[in-house]
Amino acid sequence: IQIIEKRRQTYSCACCSSCCKLASSEYSFEELKQRAKNGDVFSKEFISVFVPYDSVDTAQKLYPDYVKLLREHFKDNELYFYYCPKLGSNGLCTDYENRPNICRDFPNNPLVALPLKCSYNEWKQEVEITALTLHALIDIIGYYKQKINEVL
Protein backbone atom coordinates (compact mmCIF):
# COMPACT_ATOMS: atom_id res chain seq x y z
CA ILE A 1 0.00 0.00 0.00
CA GLN A 2 2.88 2.35 0.74
CA ILE A 3 4.24 1.69 -2.76
CA ILE A 4 0.92 2.76 -4.26
CA GLU A 5 0.87 5.95 -2.20
CA LYS A 6 4.51 6.68 -3.01
CA ARG A 7 3.81 6.34 -6.74
CA ARG A 8 0.78 8.65 -6.39
CA GLN A 9 3.03 11.37 -5.00
CA THR A 10 4.97 11.39 -8.27
CA TYR A 11 1.85 12.70 -10.04
CA SER A 12 0.19 16.04 -9.54
CA CYS A 13 -3.25 17.46 -10.08
CA ALA A 14 -3.75 19.21 -13.42
CA CYS A 15 -6.66 21.22 -11.96
CA CYS A 16 -9.22 19.90 -14.44
CA SER A 17 -11.79 20.19 -11.59
CA SER A 18 -13.57 17.02 -12.71
CA CYS A 19 -13.52 15.65 -9.16
CA CYS A 20 -15.25 18.82 -7.93
CA LYS A 21 -17.80 19.03 -10.72
CA LEU A 22 -18.91 15.41 -10.51
CA ALA A 23 -18.34 13.22 -7.48
CA SER A 24 -20.24 9.98 -7.11
CA SER A 25 -21.28 7.65 -4.33
CA GLU A 26 -23.30 4.50 -4.02
CA TYR A 27 -25.09 6.25 -1.14
CA SER A 28 -27.83 8.85 -1.34
CA PHE A 29 -27.32 12.14 0.50
CA GLU A 30 -29.66 10.95 3.27
CA GLU A 31 -27.71 7.70 3.62
CA LEU A 32 -24.44 9.63 3.75
CA LYS A 33 -25.83 11.88 6.48
CA GLN A 34 -26.87 8.80 8.48
CA ARG A 35 -23.46 7.17 8.01
CA ALA A 36 -21.78 10.41 9.12
CA LYS A 37 -24.03 10.54 12.19
CA ASN A 38 -22.93 6.97 12.97
CA GLY A 39 -19.27 7.99 12.91
CA ASP A 40 -18.21 7.31 9.33
CA VAL A 41 -15.40 9.84 8.75
CA PHE A 42 -15.46 9.62 4.96
CA SER A 43 -19.21 10.28 4.82
CA LYS A 44 -18.86 13.20 7.22
CA GLU A 45 -16.20 14.81 5.05
CA PHE A 46 -18.08 14.02 1.85
CA ILE A 47 -21.29 15.74 2.94
CA SER A 48 -19.29 18.68 4.29
CA VAL A 49 -18.05 19.31 0.74
CA PHE A 50 -20.53 17.96 -1.78
CA VAL A 51 -24.18 18.61 -2.49
CA PRO A 52 -26.34 16.34 -4.64
CA TYR A 53 -27.37 17.08 -8.20
CA ASP A 54 -31.14 17.24 -8.43
CA SER A 55 -31.15 14.19 -10.72
CA VAL A 56 -28.96 11.75 -12.59
CA ASP A 57 -30.21 13.38 -15.79
CA THR A 58 -28.79 16.75 -14.72
CA ALA A 59 -25.38 15.21 -14.09
CA GLN A 60 -25.65 13.27 -17.37
CA LYS A 61 -26.35 16.44 -19.36
CA LEU A 62 -23.40 18.26 -17.82
CA TYR A 63 -20.83 15.43 -17.93
CA PRO A 64 -22.08 12.72 -20.32
CA ASP A 65 -18.78 10.87 -20.81
CA TYR A 66 -17.90 10.64 -17.12
CA VAL A 67 -21.44 9.67 -16.08
CA LYS A 68 -21.43 6.99 -18.77
CA LEU A 69 -18.11 5.65 -17.47
CA LEU A 70 -19.41 5.54 -13.91
CA ARG A 71 -22.76 4.03 -14.84
CA GLU A 72 -20.97 1.18 -16.61
CA HIS A 73 -19.68 0.10 -13.19
CA PHE A 74 -22.87 0.59 -11.16
CA LYS A 75 -26.57 -0.09 -11.50
CA ASP A 76 -28.57 3.11 -12.04
CA ASN A 77 -30.19 2.96 -8.62
CA GLU A 78 -26.85 2.43 -6.89
CA LEU A 79 -25.14 5.65 -7.94
CA TYR A 80 -25.70 9.23 -6.86
CA PHE A 81 -23.98 12.32 -8.24
CA TYR A 82 -22.70 15.35 -6.34
CA TYR A 83 -20.80 18.57 -6.94
CA CYS A 84 -18.81 21.02 -4.85
CA PRO A 85 -20.44 24.45 -4.54
CA LYS A 86 -17.06 25.99 -3.66
CA LEU A 87 -15.75 25.57 -7.19
CA GLY A 88 -15.21 28.99 -8.74
CA SER A 89 -16.10 29.99 -12.29
CA ASN A 90 -12.36 29.74 -13.10
CA GLY A 91 -12.44 26.02 -12.20
CA LEU A 92 -10.46 26.52 -8.99
CA CYS A 93 -11.50 26.02 -5.38
CA THR A 94 -12.60 29.22 -3.69
CA ASP A 95 -11.49 27.82 -0.30
CA TYR A 96 -8.41 25.87 -1.39
CA GLU A 97 -6.31 26.52 1.73
CA ASN A 98 -9.07 25.17 3.98
CA ARG A 99 -10.14 22.20 1.86
CA PRO A 100 -10.74 18.98 3.83
CA ASN A 101 -8.66 15.81 3.60
CA ILE A 102 -11.14 14.21 1.20
CA CYS A 103 -10.09 16.86 -1.32
CA ARG A 104 -6.39 16.93 -0.41
CA ASP A 105 -6.09 13.14 -0.70
CA PHE A 106 -8.04 12.59 -3.92
CA PRO A 107 -7.61 10.11 -5.45
CA ASN A 108 -6.60 7.91 -2.55
CA ASN A 109 -7.69 4.69 -4.21
CA PRO A 110 -6.56 3.46 -7.65
CA LEU A 111 -9.71 1.37 -7.94
CA VAL A 112 -12.00 4.39 -8.38
CA ALA A 113 -13.24 5.36 -11.82
CA LEU A 114 -11.50 8.58 -12.83
CA PRO A 115 -12.55 10.94 -15.61
CA LEU A 116 -10.49 10.47 -18.74
CA LYS A 117 -8.90 13.92 -18.49
CA CYS A 118 -7.79 13.43 -14.86
CA SER A 119 -4.00 13.60 -14.58
CA TYR A 120 -4.07 10.71 -12.08
CA ASN A 121 -5.26 8.22 -14.70
CA GLU A 122 -1.69 7.27 -15.54
CA TRP A 123 -1.04 6.54 -11.83
CA LYS A 124 -4.25 4.49 -11.68
CA GLN A 125 -3.20 2.39 -14.66
CA GLU A 126 0.29 1.95 -13.25
CA VAL A 127 -0.78 0.62 -9.83
CA GLU A 128 -4.24 -0.86 -10.44
CA ILE A 129 -3.02 -4.47 -10.80
CA THR A 130 -1.04 -4.17 -7.57
CA ALA A 131 -4.08 -2.71 -5.79
CA LEU A 132 -6.37 -5.45 -7.08
CA THR A 133 -3.87 -8.10 -5.99
CA LEU A 134 -3.61 -6.58 -2.51
CA HIS A 135 -7.40 -6.37 -2.28
CA ALA A 136 -7.71 -10.04 -3.25
CA LEU A 137 -5.05 -11.06 -0.73
CA ILE A 138 -6.85 -9.18 2.03
CA ASP A 139 -10.06 -11.03 1.14
CA ILE A 140 -8.26 -14.39 1.12
CA ILE A 141 -6.58 -13.73 4.47
CA GLY A 142 -9.93 -12.65 5.92
CA TYR A 143 -11.55 -15.85 4.68
CA TYR A 144 -8.88 -18.08 6.24
CA LYS A 145 -8.90 -16.06 9.47
CA GLN A 146 -12.64 -16.66 9.71
CA LYS A 147 -12.18 -20.41 9.08
CA ILE A 148 -9.45 -20.63 11.73
CA ASN A 149 -11.66 -18.81 14.25
CA GLU A 150 -14.51 -21.22 13.51
CA VAL A 151 -12.26 -24.18 14.32
CA LEU A 152 -10.89 -22.65 17.52
Which residue ranges define each predicted feature?
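Short loop/turn segments that flank or connect secondary-structure elements
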Residues: I1-L152
